Amino acid sequence: MAKEKFVRTKPHVNVGTIGHIDHGKTTLTAAITKYLSYKGFASFVPFEQIDKAPEEKARGITINITHVEYQSEKRHYAHIDCPGHADYIKNMITGAAQMDGAILVVAATDGPMPQTREHVLLARQVNVPAMVVFLNKVDAVDDQELVDLVEMEVRDLLTKYEFPGDEIPVIRGSALLALEANDPNDAAYKPIQELIDALDSYIPEPVREVDKPFLMAVEDVFSITGRGTVATGRIERGKIRPGDEVEIVGLSYETRKTVVTSVEMFRKELDEGLAGDNVGCLLRGIDKDEIERGQVLAAPGSITPHTTFKANVYVLKKEEGGRHTPFMKGYRPQFFIRTADVTGEITELGNNAEMVMPGDNAILTIKLIYPVAIEKGMRFAIREGGRTVGAGVVAEIVE
């Protein structure tokens, strides 16, 4: 049970550290909590505690994630850190812990490395809106010009993946020196404060789900004699009121418009249903056989049906309950997209690969046998014979 009530006085923002292995992500996370504990804005979480991240399950995949929380003068932050590279890939693809912004940690001693690139690419594909950079281990580099070069390299990398590389704040410091310091006025903490200020000013405040256009995936449909057809489901975003017009999207290229005449929850009528509510929507002029599970109700024009898309996919290892063998082009598993369960064919493997192995992270082109409401950045699961074999995120709509 929760020990204390979460008091919502400051805006809440989800962030996380990303970057190459051993560049100092976990050390930085610990240093932030230590510094802010002196200000009464956090509890210090030591390195060892963050490093032994507990297991979580998301979409049938086990992921190790540590969550810490801290505050600045202006905001409340939930911060995630993952111990292993594979955990980052899995987290970003499954969306187990969403990020409103990321802290890219790059060691000045190494510069950008393969996982740095991979994490930045993933952040772009899963729509992480903004990023700040912490250039770590600058105390270990004697030549200031080298640090300048590394910063230029990082900015170029960010620009390459369509982040505003020229304007992203880059903070230089040493997470280890900060973690070892015991006085909040120690010079080693100055970069930590600069980082917090950068988060406050540069990571935009997230748009609350309730302020986005209405969308509800249809879970079940039934008819009420004399009243009409009711579609039930959880409102993913936005809000719905009786009298609102919605579109039924998916399963064909034609979308149908209808009006929600009543919104009900636990058999009581609501003035409005909000993001997160499980509701039933009574639909005007729709027969029970004209709407089914797998479609969505959405604000008109806010989402369209598609069959073909590119996705970044993590394929489960055998030990994770996934496939024991690789798959090639032409593989036809089931795709679980919101409430839709649809067969699809993998028509292209990225990087001209011959096959995809269990444990791989790959870019695939997928063609579904019928259209589904899809948008960039949305998550899905891949299943075969009743077990999850992969998880993906839509990177680009093809048609």
Curated annotation (Swiss-Prot):
Superkingdom per UniProt: Bacteria
- Major localization class: cytoplasm
Residues of the region (G3) are 81-84
> What UniProt keywords are attached to this protein's entry?
Cytoplasm, Elongation factor, GTP-binding, Hydrolase, Magnesium, Metal-binding, Nucleotide-binding, Protein biosynthesis
Record region (G4): 136-139
Residue ranges annotated for the tr-type G domain, each copy included: 10-207
Q: Do the record's keywords include Transmembrane helix?
A: no
Q: Where are the residues of the annotated region G5?
A: 174-176
> What InterPro entries does the record point to?
EF-Tu_GTP-bd, EF-Tu_GTPase, EFTu-like_2, EFTU_2, G_TR_CS, P-loop_NTPase, Small_GTP-bd, T_Tr_GTP-bd_dom
Residues annotated for GTP binding in this entry: 19-26, 81-85, 136-139
Family statement drawn from the similarity comment of this UniProt entry = Belongs to the TRAFAC class translation factor GTPase superfamily. Classic translation factor GTPase family. EF-Tu/EF-1A subfamily.
Q: Per its record, how is this protein called by name? A: Elongation factor Tu
Organism of provenance:
Pseudothermotoga lettingae (strain ATCC BAA-301 / DSM 14385 / NBRC 107922 / TMO) (Thermotoga lettingae)
